């Protein structure tokens, strides 16, 4: 498995909790007349497309990996270019899902920042926040995993050398 299930789960949960809290704050600001409903509509649209991008980026590599492990050596050699192209399509698909809300909002607003229905700033800010959540979650999980591996290596070294017995007595 390329992307650990824990990473998938934490990324989706944290981004969606962050999105819900952000939408609640935006609704509060809307009801106090600080911002318009355009921000809320744009945020909802962008959160949907950001979740699609997040799912594609986290789950599709695992699907590719499981399908690649079922191939024998000759098939892998002939399918290597296909998997390379599929990886490029996956990456460009994620970029496409970031751009879709901006294009929709731009088209509806007649290419102005704020229109009657949408505002373009949430379409830019939500994907950036998703990338930030993605980076922070992955850094924290990988850092924790590296520390656990180092502890296990140290314990294995102590057991192998007998140092742990000397320290106990």
From Swiss-Prot:
Its main location: membrane. The chain crosses the membrane at residues 12-32, 44-64, 85-105, 117-137. The keyword Disulfide bond does not apply. GO terms for biological process: proton transmembrane transport. The keyword Cell membrane applies. Keywords: Cell membrane, CF(0), Hydrogen ion transport, Ion transport, Membrane, Transmembrane, Transmembrane helix, Transport. NCBIfam families: MG406_fam (NF033688). A possible function for this protein is to guide the assembly of the membrane sector of the ATPase enzyme complex. Belongs to the bacterial AtpI family. This is ATP synthase protein I.
């Amino acid at each position: 498995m390329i992307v650990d299930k824990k990473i998938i789960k934490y990324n989706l949960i944290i981004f969606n909790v962050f999105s819900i809290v952000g939408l609640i704050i935006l609704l509060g600001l809307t009801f106090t007349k600080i911002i318009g409903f355009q921000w809320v509509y744009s945020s909802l649209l962008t959160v949907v497309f950001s979740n699609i991008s997040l799912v594609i980026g986290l789950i599709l590599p695992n699907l590719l990996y499981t399908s690649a492990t079922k191939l024998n050596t000759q098939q892998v050699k002939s399918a290597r270019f296909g998997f390379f192209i599929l990886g490029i399509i996956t990456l460009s698909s994620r970029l496409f899902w970031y751009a879709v809300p901006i294009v929709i909002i731009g088209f509806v607003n007649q290419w102005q920042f704020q229109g009657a229905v949408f505002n373009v700033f949430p379409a830019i800010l939500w994907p950036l926040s998703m990338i930030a959540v993605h980076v922070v979650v992955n850094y924290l999980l990988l850092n924790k995993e590296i520390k656990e591996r180092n502890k296990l290596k140290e314990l294995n070294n102590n057991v192998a050398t007998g140092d742990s017995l000397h320290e106990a007595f």
